[in-house]
Structures are given as structure tokens and as C-alpha cells.
């Protein structure tokens, strides 16, 4: 009888612990986990991935052309855990939505699309969002920040693994670049050619020492073409997405956000 009462007590305690764990997990997911929403940009529905609570300092994280995987979600989760409100944007899906047999995304239209994103992200906070882009998303973020109206709606740009050549379309056949590490056979734009137009907004770049897609020399060249305020952090990491040194990457990312805040146009 004593053993049975003991077992019942243990089971009861375990049950309470499980319920507490489930509750804690639910609260964590509510605070930092991903939910989704749909916004309409020039007649096209775009799914956005939301992390954190609206009202925190807003950021827009644009993915690479692989979609909402790897570094983009990592950045979103890390920043939401610090209290920021993150709008995750799938650059691959965005490009696909404007790609047809006869047309692609036009550079003149892209900044206005990001202005819609910026207005959405800023809602409820009264603060301008920072654009954070991964690879292709970094190029799109730089392009958006060259437009005077969009500049007025954002705080600056943090470019992660920024390539010089960025595509303006995406088709299934373009996935070959993941093997070749080349550039899709699509219309493109050069970030080095437009980086100087981001000023007076601050432009930060974070790059891996062993980026297999974008050599350090390429991002240094783009930095040279940009005007102040500008800054480059280089992280000792094994690949394009900093996969073996996310700890240092995360620290540099927080430093870049602080630097953006301290270098706002006067």
C-alpha cells in the first residue's frame, strides 16, 4: 500500500512537471516562435513569418534565394529572443511571384514593395524597421534602401553574405546554382553599383571568412563603393551561413544593430 501511494505521488508530480513544461513551451513559442500572416504587395499574396511580439523594435529579415531556411530563421529566432519584433520575408517566393515567361521583378518596383513591408513591420511600435538580408535578401534590402521614399521608412540595412550580383527572377531550374555556386541565368542587378545610394542611411555588412558563394574581396569591393556611414564585420566561419560559428555571428549581429541605431541620419 505504501509503495502504491508512493508511485501515485511520483506519477502526480511527473504529471504536474509535464504540464508545467508544456505551459512553458507554449509561452516560449508565443513569445519567440513563428506565426505567419499574409500581406498583399502589388496584387500578389506574400506570406510573412512573424517572431516575437509586435511593439518591439521592428526588423525585416529577408531570406536568401533558397527560401525561408537556415540563416534567416536563425536570425529571426535570435532577435525575437532579445525582444525584437521580426518580420521574416521569403525572397525566393517573392521573386517567384513576379516571374513569368515574359516578365520578372523590375528594380524600379522593388523599393515600393519593401515600403509596404516596412509599414507593416512598424505598425504598433512607432519605430522604423531595420532591413536585415541574407545573401539575395541582402541585395534586395540594399536595392530597397536606394529609394528616397523607402529610406524615409527604414532605419538602415544589415547585409549578411552580400553578393554583388543579385537575380531579379527565380525559376525551378535556377536551383542548379546550389551545386555550381554560380549566378542564375536571369536578369540581375549589382549591389556594388548602387551601394553608394544608400547614404545617409547606415549600411552594415557581416561576412564569413570562408563564404563559398561570395569571396571576402567581393564584399570589400562593394563596401568601397558605399558612402558613410558604413561598416564591415568579418566572422571566422566555414561557409556562407556561418554554420560553425553562429555564436560570434550572433554577437556581431547585435553589434551591427547597435551601430545602426547610433548612426541614424541627423
Language-model segments: residues:
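Alpha/beta-hydrolase active-site loop
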Residues: 103-124
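Short, surface-exposed "cap/lid" segments of acyl-processing enzymes
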Residues: 53-84, 88
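Short beta-strand/loop motif that positions the catalytic acidic residue
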Residues: 198-199, 205-207, 211
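Conserved alpha/beta-hydrolase "acid-adjacent" motif
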Residues: 212-218
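Catalytic active-site module of serine/aspartate enzymes centered on a nucleophile-bearing elbow/loop
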Residues: 246-266
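Primarily recognizes the serine-hydrolase "nucleophile elbow" in alpha/beta-hydrolase
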Residues: 119-178, 186
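Histidine-bearing beta->alpha loop at or near hydrolase active sites
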Residues: 93, 235-242
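N-terminal cap/lid segment of alpha/beta-hydrolase-fold proteins
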Residues: 31-53
Amino acid at each position: 500500500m505504501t509503495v502504491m501511494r508512493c508511485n501515485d505521488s511520483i506519477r502526480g508530480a511527473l504529471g504536474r512537471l509535464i504540464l508545467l513544461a508544456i505551459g512553458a513551451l507554449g509561452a516560449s513559442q508565443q513569445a519567440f516562435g513563428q506565426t505567419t500572416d499574409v500581406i498583399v504587395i502589388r496584387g500578389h499574396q506574400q506570406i510573412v513569418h512573424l517572431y516575437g511580439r509586435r511593439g518591439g523594435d521592428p526588423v525585416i529579415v529577408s531570406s536568401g534565394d533558397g527560401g525561408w531556411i537556415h540563416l534567416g530563421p536563425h536570425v529571426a529566432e535570435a532577435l525575437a529572443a532579445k525582444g525584437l519584433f521580426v518580420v521574416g520575408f521569403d525572397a525566393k517566393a517573392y521573386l517567384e511571384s513576379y516571374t513569368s515567361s515574359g516578365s520578372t521583378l523590375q528594380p524600379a518596383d522593388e523599393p515600393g514593395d519593401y515600403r509596404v513591408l516596412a509599414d507593416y513591420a512598424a505598425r504598433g511600435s512607432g519605430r522604423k524597421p531595420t532591413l536585415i538580408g541574407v545573401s539575395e535578401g541582402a541585395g534586395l534590402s540594399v536595392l530597397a534602401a536606394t529609394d528616397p521614399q523607402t529610406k524615409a521608412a527604414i532605419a538602415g540595412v544589415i547585409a549578411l553574405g552580400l553578393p554583388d550580383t543579385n537575380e531579379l527572377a527565380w525559376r525551378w531550374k535556377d536551383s542548379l546554382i546550389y551545386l555550381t555556386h554560380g549566378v542564375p541565368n536571369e536578369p540581375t542587378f549589382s549591389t556594388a553599383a548602387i551601394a553608394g545610394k544608400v547614404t545617409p542611411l547606415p549600411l552594415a555588412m557581416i561576412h564569413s571568412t570562408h563564404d563559398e558563394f561570395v569571396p571576402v574581396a567581393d564584399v570589400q569591393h562593394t563596401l568601397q563603393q558605399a558612402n558613410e556611414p558604413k561598416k564591415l564585420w568579418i566572422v571566422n566561419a566555414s561557409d556562407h551561413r556561418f554554420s560553425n560559428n553562429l555564436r560570434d555571428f550572433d554577437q556581431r549581429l547585435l553589434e551591427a544593430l547597435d551601430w545602426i541605431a547610433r548612426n541614424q541620419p541627423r
